[in-house]
Amino acid sequence: MAAGRVSVDGVSHALPEPFFVIATQNSLDQVGTSPLPEAQLDRFLMRLSLGFPDRASERALLCAGFDPSPDSPSGLSPETLQQLQDRCTNQHCSELLIDYVLDLVEVSRARHPGLSPRASQGLLAAARAWSLLQGRDHVVIDDVQAVLPAVVEHRLDAGCPARHGSPHSEALLQAVPALR
């Protein structure tokens, strides 16, 4: 899907722009659930835990009801989302920052399985988006560090149940000095 196309029964279809997938994974301790192979886990940009809403938010959710209508209001128009995605792509990354990402990935590869080129691309893309959300037009090392756990933990924990905390990210951050 990252190529902007899907195939169904041997027929290739172009995906609309903007396009992205949000997927959920059941807990591995549930019946009929098995871990995803490393190659499939690597295709997911991030693993996030949304947790539960606070009481007031859940009350608002219950009182509002559920409107499955495709005409329900959304937070962003497709055009606005596309503009934001384009702006993320244009966030400036210095050579020093790219070297920092490469250093993190290289250190991860000292142990199996290590981070793939897809992971390094995802890390930089997520850092670009984070920097935009922080109101900057360029990416700084703090942006990479902020998104690192969400981007790498599921890749380095391949086949293991989700853990609390970010042991792999913390180890990478300790092993790679952040030049400022």
Indicate residue ranges for each PLM-predicted region.
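C-terminal engagement/docking regions of AAA+ P-loop ATPases
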Residues: 110-180
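Canonical AAA+ ATPase core
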Residues: 1-76, 82-91, 128-130
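Residues that form generic nucleotide/phosphate-binding pockets
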Residues: 61, 84-87, 104, 147, ...
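Secondary-structure transition/hinge residues
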Residues: 5, 52, 70, 109-110, ...
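Conserved AAA+ ATPase small/helical "lid" subdomain
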Residues: 72-123
